[in-house]
A protein has these predicted regions:
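Short beta-strand scaffold segments in enzyme catalytic cores
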Residues: 1, 86-90
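Acidic, His/Gly-enriched loop-helix segments that form or flank divalent-metal centers
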Residues: 1-72, 76-82, 98
Length: 100
């Protein structure tokens, strides 16, 4: 079975800062954006938000991003724009759902 890691933003084990405090790692994990070439080292698929999918692909309206062991699900629902919407991904069959 496939394993997933669901986080708001960047996985804490991507942290490479010199200050290894709980607060520093927390701040990193909360605010750092995932890069297109970031890969989970343990084979899990990393599902994340925080960064709208338009930063990774040119699809309108915004849609779920798949790439390099990552799935981006932030389709900009917090923004009031016609191309932004809420996304949901059912992991059992990878079926996508979107708000109108």
């Amino acid at each position: 079975d496939q394993e997933y890691l669901l986080l708001h933003s960047c996985p804490p084990h991507f942290y490479t800062g010199k200050t290894l405090t709980k607060e520093a790692v927390w701040d990193f994990s909360l605010w750092t954006r995932v890069e297109p070439d970031d890969v989970m080292p343990d084979g899990r698929i990393f599902i994340f938000g925080h960064t709208p999918t338009e930063c990774y692909q040119d699809k309108l309206p915004l849609s779920i991003y798949y790439g390099n062991g990552k799935i981006g699900i932030d389709c900009g629902s917090g923004n009031r724009h016609e191309v932004c919407r809420l996304a949901c991904l059912r992991l059992e069959d990878m079926k996508e759902f979107y708000s109108n």
